[in-house]
A protein has these predicted regions:
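Acidic, histidine-bearing metal-coordination/catalytic regions of metal-dependent phosphoesterases
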Residues: 1-76, 80-89, 225, 363, ...
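Residue-level detector of high-confidence beta-strand sites
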Residues: 6, 278, 286, 391, ...
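Extended active-site neighborhood of metal-dependent phosphoesterases/phosphodiesterases
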Residues: 27-43, 47-49, 107-221, 225, ...
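Conserved, compact domain cores that house catalytic/ligand-binding motifs in diverse enzymes
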Residues: 58-130, 135
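Active-site neighborhood of phospho(di)ester-bond hydrolases with catalytic His/Asp-centered motifs
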Residues: 64-66, 93-99, 126-133, 226-230, ...
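Solvent-exposed loop/turn segments at secondary-structure junctions
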Residues: 68-71, 100-104, 133-138, 181, ...
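A short C-terminal boundary segment appended to hydrolase-like catalytic domains
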Residues: 331-333, 339-408, 417, 422
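C-terminal outer-membrane/trafficking sorting elements
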Residues: 413-424, 428-503
Length: 503
């Protein structure tokens, strides 16, 4: 093995060492010391692993924790559950969703809430943190007088790890394999905005907006985009973008959350974001595959904003699917609130979780494990029991070699009763056509369902012989208006469901 020494001779307690000449995708063991004393290492648990070649499709393991910096037994339980679930295997990317050290983000609180809490993980895992309001101080946004965060971390402001240079440690991007990560600063706004309380307007840094547009536009070498920051754009727990009560802190929080929703989510969605991670609300909430929701946060979503109303679970046979070309190219992403890695709210004090976009939610301690393998992303919410309480999968271009736009064929299954099944046009405007070949005589039912599974219209319910069938349907007469609907094809031994969109 080759030994290399890197020395910082300056008399300081804050050392930053720049190491050059490293190989991609390589594990390097290291030791830290002075000219007279060895402080730590070298040993098998103290190493760093360099990023793989950008665009490579090797499996990637990501760990997301949010609002974790309490230094308490809850935080330790979340940590241990993750380590046990993953058999203490290497984590490639560790993202922090803000509020990393309570209550004021001081150096001492980072020591107890972070460094003392992860003594075996930090020496071998690169952390990619986001700023939360408590990292500025407990009086933020009214007073922001603490920035120990910027002294503790050195973050890529010049595009050193991939992406576009931001010039600001509060927001940055990096590449790891075929994933592009974007970290935003949801707390980056001027305190002057708060003087208009309660009619506050929040305008985030124009520099961050411009940078995000440029960064995502230049991201052409990765297959996935994961964005993360602190103040979630959607939640219905301890904080909500739809809060309508009288608590001044929650009013301000709601305005900040809506600002992230309205100013940044459209940019992220327009550039094909796949997964958005955030914290702030002390619970776990996970959305459907969605696009373009800027509604009220109530329990009933505009149908057109939910692109897939299923569970997203591979175990249910219902993974979310995205296409990279065609009429729905790169549309849709999943939003996860993971503000529960050390504390949670409760149904008693904070009320029910009933957000229009969320399919699974709970006041439950835990963290999120994400695994990316080529064109498949799997996510698992690991609670303190050490099990996956929730999971979902996104697959890109599933079984597709040339993506048609019209007609829209349904993938065939071996020995299927239906062959050459297609629906066109899709999206539906006024009329649409259904075509299929029936392999065996069957009693056939074709129904239109809404996303809850309720039947809107029955198109066919009859015995049919072997042969080819074509039906042209007046969409308006069947109840299809703007939104997402399901077409259900059913026989005694087979059930197929195809999503369609009315315009």
């Amino acid at each position: 093995a080759t030994m290399v020494s890197v020395i910082d001779a300056s008399a300081t307690t804050e050392h930053e060492l720049n190491i050059t000449g490293l190989q991609t995708g390589t594990r390097y063991f290291y030791a830290i010391g002075s000219s007279t004393d060895l402080l730590s290492g070298p040993d098998s648990g103290q190493y760093f692993q360099t990023s793989p070649v950008v665009g490579s499709i090797d499996p990637i393991r990501i760990w997301a924790v949010g609002d974790m910096g309490e230094g308490n037994t809850n935080q330790a339980a979340v940590r241990d559950a993750y380590l046990n679930y993953t058999n203490n295997d290497h984590t490639d990317v560790w993202v922090w969703l803000g509020d990393n050290a309570y209550d004021d983000g001081t150096d001492a609180e980072y020591q107890t809430g972070v460094f003392d809490m992860y003594p075996t993980i930090l020496p071998r895992t690169v952390a990619w943190p986001a700023l939360g309001n408590h990292d500025y101080g407990s009086t933020h946004p009214f007073v922001s007088d603490n920035q120990d965060y910027l002294d503790i971390f050195t973050l890529p402001t010049a595009g050193e790890a991939g992406g576009t240079a931001s010039g600001d440690e509060g927001f940055y991007s990096f590449d790891y394999g075929n994933v592009h990560f974007v970290c935003l600063n949801s707390e980056n706004y001027t305190p002057m905005d708060l003087l208009l309380y309660p009619n506050i307007t929040i305008t985030h840094s124009p520099a961050m907006v411009t940078w995000l547009e440029n960064d995502l536009a230049s991201n052409t070498n990765t297959d996935w985009v994961i964005a993360y920051f602190h103040a979630t754009p959607y939640a219905d727990g301890t904080h909500s973008e739809a809060y309508s009560g009288s608590d001044p802190i929650k009013i301000v929080d709601g305005i900040i959350m809506r600002a992230m929703r309205d100013q940044f989510v459209p940019i992220l969605e327009n550039h094909g974001v796949d997964l958005i991670l955030a914290g702030h609300s002390h619970d776990y909430e996970r959305s459907y595959l969605t696009y373009g929701n800027y509604g009220t946060g109530g329990p009933y979503p505009p149908d057109s904003t939910i692109l897939d109303g299923g569970t997203g679970r591979l175990s249910d046979g219902a993974p979310y699917q995205k296409m990279t070309s065609g009429p729905f190219a790169n549309k849709g992403g999943v939003f996860c609130v993971v503000g529960c890695s050390a504390k949670t709210g409760s149904y008693t004090s904070d009320g029910p979780l009933n957000h229009e976009l969320m399919i699974f939610d709970d006041y439950r301690l835990g963290s999120l494990l994400i695994e990316v393998n080529d064109n498949q992303l799997d996510a698992f919410f690991i609670d303190t029991s050490g099990t996956a309480w929730d999971e979902f999968t996104i697959i890109k271009d599933l079984g597709v070699t040339g993506i048609p736009t019209d007609p829209f064929p349904i993938p065939e299954e071996d020995e299927s009763v239906f062959n050459n099944l297609s629906i066109y046009p899709n999206p539906i405007i006024d009329w649409f056509t259904i075509e299929y070949h029936l392999n065996t005589p069957e009693e056939v039912s074709i129904e239109i369902l809404d996303l809850t599974g309720k039947t809107i219209a029955t198109l066919i319910n009859e015995n049919q012989k072997v042969g080819d069938y074509t039906y042209t349907v007046d969409a308006k007469n069947t109840g299809i208006v703007q939104g997402v609907f399901l077409l259900q094809f059913k026989t005694a031994g087979e059930l197929k469901i195809q999503k369609t969109i009315g315009q």
